[in-house]
């Protein structure tokens, strides 16, 4: 590959737009695909994505299009940044058109419902024998496009993928770390969305710093417990894609999932909240999926269970909190295996 690569970013939401803008600013031939033709033409003409990132000028080198085939033609890197619910459909549509030697990257943080597959596993099914990577970490799109100092993780079993993605994305304000635990990095990004809803609820109820610290720590314990049972490396959850992403998402109202939790904590219904927020909050779907998997595997996840009771079983938040606080008290840390 030469220094200047051809990169396609599929998905014109906030994160897809932000990373496409970085790549274009780095001097690569960058194409941002949006599903809606009118939106794509408007963003291309106005040099702004007013629906998701209003007020931020897009790099002049960024080409915005609704032509999926043209966007990936001769691409060195194809990045999928679409919601998890439409991920497989987009992967299947684009599969025949991805160049043979292209690297395919997922930035989507979610889990497919019935299969419990992560996005890179869907890519393996739909695309066959391609080099795959996952980009994940504590990354708000708004701060990326503002050129705030940001760190992220590229995870792949292929050194060539890691090196290429670092070359494509890295800038003076965007630092890319490496990890070979693709499954763990991706699982961390999906699971933390659940706990952002929990901490948002706690904030709405007026809980203080003691509560926040307890929730963050116990959330990390639950994430790690499930992830290691599924085969991930527990050490991954001590890095940017684990505890880093958890802290960011659980402490800021820039997080859609945190805002969902906050609104529910203030008494709004789930349907009302999702309608008002106007964007996908992956954590809501992930709660159901993870609850079912934890029950199936016999994994102790009391925060997931409690949140499921509030969101989908009609239980009162304070009743659930009381149950969590008065339940059996386990050890804080297993000295052989980490946080319990």
From Swiss-Prot:
NCBIfam families: PRK00094.1-2, PRK00094.1-4, PRK00094.2-4. The keyword Isomerase does not apply. Its main location: cytoplasm. GO terms for cellular component: cytosol. GO terms for molecular function: glycerol-3-phosphate dehydrogenase [NAD(P)+] activity; NAD binding. NADPH binds at residues 14-15, 35, 109, 141, 256, 280, 282. Belongs to the NAD-dependent glycerol-3-phosphate dehydrogenase family. Pathway: Membrane lipid metabolism; glycerophospholipid metabolism. InterPro entries: 6-PGluconate_DH-like_C_sf, 6PGD_dom2, G3P_DH_NAD-dep, G3P_DH_NAD-dep_C, G3P_DH_NAD-dep_N, NAD(P)-bd_dom_sf. The active site is at 192 (proton acceptor). It catalyses: sn-glycerol 3-phosphate + NAD(+) = dihydroxyacetone phosphate + NADH + H(+); sn-glycerol 3-phosphate + NADP(+) = dihydroxyacetone phosphate + NADPH + H(+). Its EC number is 1.1.1.94. Keywords: Cytoplasm, Lipid biosynthesis, Lipid metabolism, NAD, NADP, Nucleotide-binding, Oxidoreductase, Phospholipid biosynthesis, Phospholipid metabolism. Sn-glycerol 3-phosphate binds at residues 109, 137, 192, 245, 255-257. It is found in: Cytoplasm. GO terms for biological process: carbohydrate metabolic process; glycerol-3-phosphate biosynthetic process; glycerol-3-phosphate catabolic process; glycerophospholipid biosynthetic process. This is Glycerol-3-phosphate dehydrogenase [NAD(P)+]. Pfam families: NAD_Gly3P_dh_C (PF07479), NAD_Gly3P_dh_N (PF01210). SUPFAM superfamilies: 6-phosphogluconate dehydrogenase C-terminal domain-like, NAD(P)-binding Rossmann-fold domains.
